[in-house]
Amino acid sequence: MKRYAAAALVAAVALPLMACSTGDQGGDKSALTSGPIKIWYSTNEQEIAWAEKVVEAWNADHPDEKVTAEAIPAGKSSEDAISAAITAGNTPCLVYNTAPAAVPAFQKQGGLVDLSTTFADGEDFITGRSGGAADGFRSPDGDLYQVPWKANPFMLYYNKDMLAAAGLDADNPKLETYDDVLAAAKAIKAAGAADYVLYPPASGDYTNPLFDFYPFYLANSGGTQLVADGKATFTSAEGVETLEFWKTLYAEGYSSAEAYSGDAWAGPFADGVAALGIAGPWGAGAFDGKVNYGVVPLPTAAGTAPEETYTFGDSKNVGLYTSCENKQTAWDFVKFSMNADNDLALLETTGQFPIRTDVAEVAADYLASNPLLATFASSVPLTVDVPNIANSTEIWQTFRDAWGASVQGQDDLTSTMGGAADKIDALIAQG
């Protein structure tokens, strides 16, 4: 799962942004029919196991609306396969692996059904299940072209042994604010407990803000995305606080601007090079048996209560595609697959969280026996993903270039980031 977020954002660069739609937006309620449908799911072994059981249960009760399911065809990426199918007009009805970053391109191709206008209960079902998190997946027209499905909320992992070696409380570490983290970093460095404190991917790749700035900014800003209302947001007071925090980490040698020689995502923490790490619940698989770790919410400038701390969701969603003949069955299957029982089964089978506001209640017994996952559960309703915007690749790369020059480098932070915001605003205006 370590490259999950990066793969989702990478999708944006590989997809053809068609100048004209190759299909309608699927908003005609009068055209809704029922019957057999086809779906795709990811090649992840655990997700396949979950999907097969859900499909089997559905088919047993709906012989006239049979669901045929298969893994996304092999290729360069699942996004490439979906885009090619949209162009050819032969997509399945549903894809249970739709990356939020790819939705603008799929929508521009005319491949996605407008769920808000096509189904009478579209808005009610999605917002009723996912709450305010659904708003982060809305397209610029305000409608939903994807069903929020599952999330991997990012939190801050800490190495208990390294904190103890630095004379810090390893069981209840003080890491709520930026100043707390910087104070801990000073102690860790002075004690020689770790080479670095935080060591996120350091290269200039446009996906890397998802592993340093963006999760921290979401936490500090109350869930504000990089772009909102047609403008870049990161030069706000909250954005500058986060940028200055990271600049201090690099300036003091608490973080490294050199690319890590191993796994850039999980490696520094798993290998004992960094005392802190940023990851979702997938991090446990990389850290178990290697690090004696704990997990806390991401810090903010002033300190934010855990139940109010937003974070990056690293989500994958479900798209309903316009070439589907039996859209009503597809929609009914979506709702069935995301009922409480099937959402619980998703968590139990894959370790990934359904994006539902009551996940802690639905999975109470399971989470009671899995304390690490229970820690992440409270963050699920507070997850936010990348903004649904055109030119997303260029926008994120513009931000990353400015980051490298001013946060990791020596350029003036205010003028460099202000210039990047102006460039991003121009890219947004291009549409």
Question: What residue spans do the PLM features occupy?
Answer:
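A structural signal for short loop-to-beta-strand junctions that line the ligand-binding cleft
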Residues: 92-93, 124-163, 307-310, 382-389
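Extracytoplasmic/periplasmic solute-binding protein
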Residues: 140-149, 154, 179-231, 274
